[in-house]
Amino acid sequence: MARIAGVDLPRRKHVAYALPYLFGIGRTLALQICEKTNIPQNKRVEELSDAEVKAIRDLLDAEYKVEGDLRREVQLNIKRLMDLGCYRGLRHRRGLPANGQRTHTNARTRKGPRKGMLQRRPAATK
């Protein structure tokens, strides 16, 4: 099993479909990596030689940020926005959408489950 950037790639998949299992690599970038390392896209991960795995690993280390480094950079960017106190930072701090989406009826993913209305108790009768 090929282990790249701390992630085990699925053995039975083609290289072009296995590389997107790494955070920060999508389908297009996976195809570019295959092209740069001269590895056929339809070759399966289990068929890769140690030299080919090393070539992919070296290319990722040299040219791209993936996994932990990329996650850290994204978190630092969000933290910087919050420290600046700009509008986007405030939206992140409040857990609301930051890119202008409506929140009156939607944005349930960011806002969490509905709070529900409080039920009034009927007045006591004498």
From Swiss-Prot:
Q: Name one GO cellular component term.
A: cytosol
Classification via Pfam families: Ribosomal_S13
Give me the stretches of Basic residues compositional bias.
105-118
Family matches, as InterPro entries? Rbsml_uS13_C (IPR027437), Ribosomal_uS13 (IPR001892), Ribosomal_uS13-like_H2TH (IPR010979), Ribosomal_uS13_bac-type (IPR019980)
Q: Which Gene3D superfamilies match?
A: 1.10.8.50, 30s ribosomal protein s13, domain 2
Q: How does it assemble?
A: Part of the 30S ribosomal subunit. Forms a loose heterodimer with protein S19. Forms two bridges to the 50S subunit in the 70S ribosome.
What role does this protein play?
Located at the top of the head of the 30S subunit, it contacts several helices of the 16S rRNA. In the 70S ribosome it contacts the 23S rRNA (bridge B1a) and protein L5 of the 50S subunit (bridge B1b), connecting the 2 subunits; these bridges are implicated in subunit movement. Contacts the tRNAs in the A and P-sites.
Family recorded in the similarity comment: Belongs to the universal ribosomal protein uS13 family.
Q: What is this protein called?
A: Small ribosomal subunit protein uS13
Q: Which organism is the protein's source?
A: Sorangium cellulosum (strain So ce56) (Polyangium cellulosum (strain So ce56))
From which lineage does this chain's organism come?
Answer: Bacteria, Pseudomonadati, Myxococcota, Polyangia, Polyangiales
